[in-house]
């Protein structure tokens, strides 16, 4: 009888500890981060041939991926009309997005500003329940 009690206690303890471990691991998981970028392209040919391949390489190297957007794919829901290019990017977490942004700002200043003006906003995702 005593050994059955010990086994039952061990089983209950393992469930309690296991559930606590899952909660801790879940709480430590980083949330994805998103970049919403508005681009007013002045020279689409130059932008597409010269700047865009380098920007796409930066996104990939930075761990990002395209979620939505492109040339003339956005519509205005209210307020001013959208610029010629709007892009939504996803990154594994805000730290990776920030690291990407440092490199991307440099590329935009050195090359992209010849062809377009940029406005970007970063936002952290929310936990899905």
What residue ranges belong to the model's regions?
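Bacterial N-terminal signal peptides
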Residues: 10-20
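Bacterial N-terminal signal peptides that target proteins for export
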Residues: 1-11
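Short S/T/G/P-rich N-terminal loop/turn motif that feeds into the first structured element of a domain
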Residues: 18-98, 124-129
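Alpha-helix boundary/capping residues
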Residues: 54, 103-105
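A common structural junction motif
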Residues: 105-115
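C-terminal end-helix/capping segment
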Residues: 113-129
């Amino acid at each position: 009888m005593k050994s059955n009690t010990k086994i039952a206690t061990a089983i209950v303890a393992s469930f309690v500890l296991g559930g606590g471990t899952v909660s801790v691991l879940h709480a430590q998981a980083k949330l994805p981060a998103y970049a919403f970028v508005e681009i007013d392209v002045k020279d689409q040919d130059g932008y597409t041939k010269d700047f865009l391949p380098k920007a796409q390489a930066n996104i990939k190297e930075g761990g990002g991926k395209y979620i939505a957007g492109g040339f003339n794919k956005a519509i205005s829901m209210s307020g001013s009309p959208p610029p010629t290019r709007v892009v939504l990017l996803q990154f594994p977490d805000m730290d990776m997005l920030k690291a990407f942004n440092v490199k991307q700002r440099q590329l935009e200043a050195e090359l992209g500003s010849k062809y377009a003006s940029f406005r970007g906003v970063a936002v952290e995702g929310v936990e899905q329940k």
